[in-house]
């Protein structure tokens, strides 16, 4: 279960990072 929790947390971190970059991309467009 610990591996699954780590994976979900890691993907959540990536999602937030991509979301921030996506917002910045929208602002620059």
Swiss-Prot record:
Subcellular location as annotated: Secreted
A cellular component term (GO) from this record? extracellular space
Induction of its expression: Produced in the A cells of the islets of Langerhans in response to a drop in blood sugar concentration.
Supply one GO molecular-function term: hormone activity
Q: Which GO terms describe its biological process?
A: adenylate cyclase-modulating G protein-coupled receptor signaling pathway; negative regulation of apoptotic process; positive regulation of insulin secretion involved in cellular response to glucose stimulus; protein kinase A signaling
Q: Which residues carry this modification: Phosphoserine?
A: 2
Q: Which InterPro entries match?
A: Glucagon, Glucagon_GIP_secretin_VIP
Would you identify the family this protein belongs to, as annotated?
A: Belongs to the glucagon family.
Instruction: Tell me which PANTHER family the record gives.
Output: GLUCAGON (PTHR11418), PRO-GLUCAGON (PTHR11418:SF0)
This protein's name:
Glucagon
